[in-house]
Amino acid sequence: MALKLYPLGIQTFERIRKENKLYIDKTEYVYRLTHTSGTYFFLGRPRRFGKSLFLTTLQSYFEGKKDLFNGLAIEKLEKEWTEYPVLHFDLSGGKHMNKEQLERYLAFILETEEKKWGITQPQIDANNRLTELINTAYEKSGKQVVVLIDEYDAPMLDVVHEQEQLDTLRNIMRNFFSPLKYSEAKLRFVFLTGITKFSQISIFSELNNITNISMNDDYAGICGITKEELLMQMSEDIEELARRRNITKEQVIDKLKENYDGYHFTRFSPDIFNPYSLLSCFTENEFGSYWFTSGTPTYLINMMRKYQVVPTDVITRVEADASEFDAPTENMPTIMPLLYQSGYITIKEYHEDYNYYVLDVPNKEVKMGLTKALIPSYVTQNTLATTNTARRIAQALDKQNMEEALTLLQTFLGTVPYCNNAHYEGHYQQMLFVIFSLLTDYQVDVEVHTPNGRVDIVLLTHTDLFLLEIKLDKSAKSAMQQINQKNYHKRFALSGKPITKVGINFDSKTGNIENWIIEKA
């Protein structure tokens, strides 16, 4: 049992404070955001990352509920505590809907706010109803209105791969948001959250002064949990988890970091832990997979198919300009913006001199989740059999026995149904990449450059370095000849580990390994 009451599944700041559950203090960001120039703000973060909680924190702040903030950072910062009328719209319930269903849903959430303000005979169209709500709240309170919109993109995410349906739903949402522009004089503060970044032209047609704080260093830690917050507010829980797992406190911190840390959303961001996985780990006292298994969105899988994503496109470090990943998702040339904004890849490095970023999967949990999600497309529908085989291969490699590892792989592939891509050499490279990526403690790279060419696969274990060259319908001998003729192994001479060369030949008729040759460098 956890030492503290964790707010898993609770996204309401007021409830968390009243029920004395753990709250990671983000109120300094509330003060900073509400005391800066500008009226319209947008924050993009992955699902289950604390966006809704921050939104309800803003709501309690603007409603003047000072008592809820006792002992928090903002208590010493804020002097006025002015109360404003707040309109809060949660669009997360608008998923998987067609045109008529979405229009009814908007009518429903508008009606909830209309009842609060005594509007009994509302307008018909959503934009006119929102305009009337803003006008009524402004006139009855005598103060400017605060509008908070959570998960603004939820109605559109599931159809982002279907252009016609996307255009239809996007027009509905653009119409709904339109009063936010021409009601500016009556608005104190407008804040929208979401996962993805849609272009202002497509959604906020005239709202050209919205400030996107998603990659602003001043708000790097606005969602998620930093290492400093972890150590300061969860120290007792770390010790309890160490006791239960019979490991040291330092080992617990290392495992938490390996599994759930590694997110960066700005150039100079501190390491950010996934809050959902971190709190779930403390609740369950297990280093499990929580965020990924809580629901891989169907839109992501659909888009990966649409863009014909191969595993190495996802589970490999990549250099990119900000415009290549912090970009609108509706017309993206690659899947990178969606992977980044959804939290499946993140910023790992920023090189200021040349203004470019290095992106990669954030941590072990996400890497394993993505790898398993790709198994059906590149190995077999039987994910369990694949992961079990990968585990046995890892045990063989831990014994420095590549012969046994390849025998296990050959036996396993003999049970896998024939694949339509079996006549492409690249298919086998991707298949091996997926299987080896399941060996979580190892590093696997493909198409690694050397002075004389590129190695198909480089596998780095705790003790050894393996160079794999793949051939299709040729021979393992020709694969080994290529390794030796091009001296691939010399590129890795300073690795400090024994190097093993592996030539593998696949048979396109069976989709399996025909033979292999193993040599020490």
Please provide the spans of the model-predicted regions.
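Active-site metal-binding core of divalent-cation-utilizing nuclease and nuclease-like domains
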Residues: 136-141, 435-463
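Metal-dependent nuclease catalytic cores in nucleic-acid-processing enzymes
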Residues: 176-183, 337-345, 433-437, 482-502
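Domain-level recognition of nuclease-like catalytic cores that cleave nucleotide substrates
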Residues: 491, 495-521
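Phosphate-binding site recognition
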Residues: 1-424, 439-440
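Conserved catalytic cores of phosphodiester-cleaving nucleases, focusing on short active-site segments
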Residues: 432, 455-472, 486
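Structural motif
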Residues: 146, 464-468, 500
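Mg2+/Mn2+-dependent nuclease catalytic core
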Residues: 166-171, 472-489
